[in-house]
């Protein structure tokens, strides 16, 4: 009992300062970024950007108004995407293709900051996500039953007073800040607890064959699991801590792990949100996993000989 109690206390002492530091870092990014996006949306700038890119979406079997959804997704989160898709009421096939693309390309500013801190190039990883999003759209347009309806929708968001827009932003960001503070600290405490009692190896060992298939080093296993369960923003504390402790080398994080999780992450909460629109869950998951695996192997095959590729060994 004393060993367990001591382990819990030690885990809390080690995780609390790191959890607070990471949570504050995320919050400092989240508040100004979300406010800027609110201003862009209110001013019509997001819609203007979408209007320029809209015509290209027909090649993915999507109406031009899809650009509004994807651009919104890149700057905001999946909750905003669900809100816009609800307003547009797209045909089911087109909605599912677009939703899966948004599951790849969303929250660019905040999530890119996380991946940059763990060793990736901000520009490079965003290009990977955009390419991955397009690849997912192409795949689904080819294999999903049905075809483009040809129905064009018009995006006419309801105009509200500016003070109401600010209030809506404040309400939303307050909830987000609270979730960041709570989840980041809980996750980091659980990680420290698992390290204290040697439980992380119990997670890594059974997943080792899967990690090899995906082209990922075994040392990335725990961060990969966290990113797939809670996403990049909330899981950032784990990834950053693993990086600082040397369990994730720069090659692991930047060249391999981030290439995968930038395309395929948060496989629980985010896809489930789209069930409210009647979308089928499996279409929202497997295309991202396949494209993410392809992205990692492509990266491994195209790395120059001067860049060391980590072997599948456990980093103690």
Can you describe what each PLM-predicted range is?
Residues 63-120, 214-274:
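Alpha-helical membrane segments and immediately flanking helix-loop junctions
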Residues 36-47, 80-85, 195, 267-276, ...:
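Juxtamembrane "helix exit" motif at the C-terminal ends of alpha-helical transmembrane segments
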Residues 12, 79-101, 127-139, 159-166, ...:
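Alpha-helical membrane-embedding segments
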Residues 73-86, 121-128, 149-157, 178-185, ...:
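Juxtamembrane/interfacial segments around transmembrane helices
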């Amino acid at each position: 009992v004393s060993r367990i109690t001591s382990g819990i206390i030690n885990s809390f002492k080690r995780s609390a300062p790191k959890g607070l530091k990471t949570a504050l870092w995320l919050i400092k990014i989240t508040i100004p970024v979300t406010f800027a996006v609110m201003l862009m949306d209110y001013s019509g700038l997001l819609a203007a950007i979408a209007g320029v890119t809209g015509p290209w979406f027909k090649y993915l079997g999507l109406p031009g108004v899809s650009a509004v959804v994807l651009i919104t997704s890149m700057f905001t989160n999946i909750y905003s995407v669900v809100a816009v898709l609800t307003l547009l009421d797209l045909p089911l096939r087109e909605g599912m293709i677009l939703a899966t693309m948004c599951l790849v390309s969303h929250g660019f500013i905040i999530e890119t900051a996380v991946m940059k801190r763990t060793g990736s190039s901000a520009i490079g990883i965003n290009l990977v996500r955009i390419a991955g999003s397009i690849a997912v759209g192409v795949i689904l347009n080819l294999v999903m039953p049905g075809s483009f309806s040809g129905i064009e929708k018009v995006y006419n968001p309801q105009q509200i007073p500016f003070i109401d827009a600010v209030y809506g932003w404040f309400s939303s960001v307050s909830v987000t800040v609270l979730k960041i503070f709570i989840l980041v600290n809980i996750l980091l405490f659980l990680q420290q607890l698992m390290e204290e009692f040697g439980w992380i190896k119990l997670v890594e060992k059974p997943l080792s064959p899967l990690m090899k298939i995906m082209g990922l080093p075994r040392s990335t296993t725990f961060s990969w699991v966290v990113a797939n369960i809670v996403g990049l923003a909330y899981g950032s504390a784990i990834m950053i801590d693993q990086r600082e402790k040397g369990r994730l080398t720069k090659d692991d994080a930047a060249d391999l792990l981030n290439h995968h999780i930038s395309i395929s992450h948060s496989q629980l909460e985010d896809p489930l949100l789209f069930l409210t629109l009647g979308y089928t869950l499996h279409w929202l998951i497997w295309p991202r996993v396949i494209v993410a695996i392809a992205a990692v192997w492509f990266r491994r095959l195209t790395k120059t000989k001067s860049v060391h590729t980590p072997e599948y060994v456990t980093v103690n």
